[in-house]
Amino acid sequence: TFTHYSNASYNQTILQKDAHISMGVENTYDLALNGSPYLIGAITTYGDSTNNSLNIKAGSSVEFFTFLPKKDKNGNNTFDERITHLVGGLAYQGNVKNNKIFIKDANMIIHGPSKAYASLAAAHISAGYIDSESDKNFQASKNLLDIDSFNLDMYMNHDKQPLAYNSVLFADFLGGKTEQGQALDNTINIKRY
């Protein structure tokens, strides 16, 4: 769901068993990502996002792609801001409240480059998220990230499955996040990891 100059409330995105989401480009070692891959319960610009949810059910899978490291103004490596985002409710210039992400026995798959035995990816996982470019404060409150186990795996483009491989997911796990304002009474509930 997307709204502009209005509120987004009580929307759901549900990944059922065997659903597979693949967002990104094949060769991010040589080619920068083009746009930001988002999987969201609801997004609004200039409004509030409340009571929305992203539900990633058992047996479903989300594929994360590798990313190019970028340099900040001090010359340090930093994540490409166009990494994969999983968000329950997102607002640009608005408040987020009572949004949720549920992850239960889902598959998080790192997409390895051709012939690779190791790969890494970055992600931003937040039940409620506010992006703001003004002096006004916005509030992220009572959002819930609920994790009941997920399986980390790697997709490999090989003729034969190797005996061993490495997959690493660098992620920010957040109940609620605001670029400017207050984050109050947000929860991360981890049952199994």
Residue ranges and their predicted role:
Residues 1-85, 89-193:
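Surface-exposed loop/turn motifs in large extracellular/passenger domains
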